[in-house]
A protein has these predicted regions:
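Bacterial N-terminal signal peptides
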Residues: 7-16
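Right-handed parallel beta-helix/beta-spiral solenoid domain characteristic of secreted/periplasmic
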Residues: 34-36, 40-44, 58-63, 69, ...
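Positively charged n-region of N-terminal signal peptides that target proteins for export
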Residues: 1-4
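Right-handed parallel beta-helix/beta-solenoid
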Residues: 17-48, 52, 65
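Glycine- and acidic/polar-rich repeat regions and solenoidal domains
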Residues: 71, 88-103, 116-310
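Extended beta-solenoid/beta-helix repeat architectures
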Residues: 54, 74-78, 306
């Protein structure tokens, strides 16, 4: 099959990976209930909104800073969005269930326009968002200076989509926490996002069965100490397309991308690297590390800057 045709097919799959679901059940469902949150509103905190919201709700949060305002979301259909500007969620020592600023354990949930920062918990595994159940879309959010940016449970039915977001300076510093850590879930899609300056951990780590990493910037930056820029420790199917991936001269690990180093656990284990720019400033840096046993490894039309080959 011609190389150009393979690339078109891969890009088409990347755009269409998530199955289309009916937004609401058949019949005549009630209109969503809109709950407005803010210091001048009847519902003043997100914690209060989480308790009163039903299974079909839109939460609109007034712009501003919300300190120690943590919540658990269990609704089946939920939209959380900032209104009138950014909403800054500062942990300030608080956490929901000892896990995160937000624990999301519901159905179809979307989050847009929030800045998550400062999460610290006794287990040293705190997150801006702990995602434990359902299908979650995160759009136009930032995750800065948490122990993990987003951390998921290990559930084979979870689906996580991230769009146009930023992850930086997350990590406990022990190499066990990361900017983004997707566990053994069904699907991960990340597009248009910026990952940088993980504290010893990875910029992006995923154990998902299927991964679409498309049109992102994963660069550790000046003074960065991240380990891998991109790791799939258990393989799976990974489409890595159109990204800029680069490491720092102060990195903790000379490898940019790693695949299958903890053993292959999924029925299919395939890596596709198309149209990326890979930057390695180190004399002994390694662009790609793949453990033996992968079903397929394909690399086309990547730009390599610095030392190293594919």
């Amino acid at each position: 099959m011609p190389r150009w045709l393979i690339q078109i097919l891969v890009m088409s799959v990347c755009l269409l990976w998530m199955p289309v679901r009916a937004a609401v059940p058949l019949g005549e469902p009630a209109a969503p209930v809109v709950i407005k949150v803010g210091p001048e509103r009847a519902v003043k905190t997100l914690a209060a909104a989480a308790k009163v919201a039903g299974n079909r709700a839109i939460i609109e949060v007034d712009a501003g800073e919300y300190v120690a305002d943590v919540a658990v979301w269990t609704q089946e259909q939920l939209v959380l969005r900032a209104a009138g500007g950014r909403v800054r969620l500062v942990a300030a020592g608080a956490s929901a269930e000892g896990k995160a600023i937000w624990v999301i354990r519901g159905g179809q949930v979307s989050v847009e326009g929030f800045d998550f920062s400062g999460t610290r918990v006794p287990s040293k595994n705190g997150a801006g968002i702990r995602f434990e159940k359902g299908q979650l879309t995160v759009r136009d959010c930032t995750f800065i200076n948490n122990e993990n940016g987003i951390l998921t449970a290990n559930r084979p039915d979870l689906e996580l989509r991230i769009e146009n977001s930023e992850f930086g300076f997350n990590g406990q510093g022990d190499g066990q926490s990361h900017n983004l850590y997707a566990g053994a879930i069904a699907h991960l899609s990340v597009s248009g996002s910026y990952f940088h300056h993980a504290k010893v951990g990875h910029l992006l780590k995923s154990r998902a069965a299927v991964n679409y990493i498309v049109n992102n910037r994963l660069t550790d930056g000046v003074g960065g100490t991240a380990s891998y820029e991109l790791e799939f420790p258990n393989g799976g199917v990974a489409y890595v397309v159109g990204n800029v991936i680069g490491q720092s001269t102060t990195t903790e690990n000379p490898h940019l991308i790693s695949f299958g180093v903890e053993g292959y656990t999924w029925p299919r284990n395939e890596l596709y690297l198309f149209n990326n720019t890979l930057f390695n400033p180190l004399p002994d840096g390694v662009l790609l590390r793949v453990s033996p046993g992968a079903d397929a490894v394909k690399s086309f039309d990547n730009v390599l800057v610095g030392r190293g080959t594919l």
